[in-house]
Amino acid sequence: MAHSTAHTDSAAHLVLSLSCPDRPGIVHAVTGTLARRGGNITESKQFGDSSTGLFFMRVQVLTTVPRVELEKDLAELAGEYEMEWSLDEVGRAMRTLIMVSKEGHCLTDLLFRARSQGLPVDVVGVVGNHETLRDVAEFYGVPFHHIPVTKETKEAAETELLGLVDSLNVELVVLARYMQILSPALCERLHGGVINIHHSFLPSFKGARPYAQAHERGVKLIGATAHYVTADLDEGPIIEQDVTRAGHEDSVSVLQAKGQDVERRVLAQAVRWHTEHRVLLNGHRTVVFA
């Protein structure tokens, strides 16, 4: 039987996500710690991966205890269980920087969702290596930063980008069809905090002209993949994928239009899950508590 969760106006709704080596008693230890602080768990999911020996957990909890006190308890628990963990407010808008080149379908979708509160993101800026999408960003009242990239200026451009990330207190970078490869050093610096949308159902059709490749192969499904960015091009841990039907009569342009619809959907879902702390890294894979 469904029931409402009792809480006061002063209660904080927090989300705890964690990973650690798997062993007996983790769930009991975590929930016990929350219960001793008067926490009321509203959502809980966990997963033990026998192939890696790691345990993953996500808990939403209502509590009137000051957050700093709860964090102190969790830090002690983390030391005992070798946990990597984070604690945040449920629904808090994550400070996000979007990077683009010339195609605007993903940017427009993300900005609309952010403005209409359809995504828990605070878009603090848009970076483009071309000026093409400045008008789109400014239409939504978001500052646009033009950082051109050439082979000769790549290092300086990435230094400028990192300065922007630091000055704006950016928590998440989204590559919304940004057509430049990030250096290994930049990938390492922003590890786990950069999401890319790839215009195919990885690992198929990597590189340029994916829809032309798909057309040449006569595929019956086309898709898109959102993944974390690593130094290995298009090989980062996958967060979300989806597909749509393709017909023998579809031209390259029709396939591209269908694919762009999927790209928008997949990227928005990946961003949502990341900002809601539903995605945990598991080596080269992810655990997604959808």
Predicted regions and their residues:
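Adenosine-nucleotide cofactor-binding segment
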Residues: 138, 142-168
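Histidine-anchored nucleotide/phosphate-binding helix
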Residues: 105-115
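Short, glycine-rich nucleotide/cofactor-binding loops
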Residues: 96-105
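Donor/substrate-binding cores of folate-linked one-carbon enzymes
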Residues: 130, 153-159, 168-290
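A short alpha->loop->secondary-structure connector
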Residues: 114-122
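Short internal beta-strands
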Residues: 121-132
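Conserved beta-strand segments of alpha/beta enzyme cores
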Residues: 40, 84, 122, 143-145, ...
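A conserved regulatory-domain signal marking ACT and ACT-like small-molecule sensing domains
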Residues: 1-94
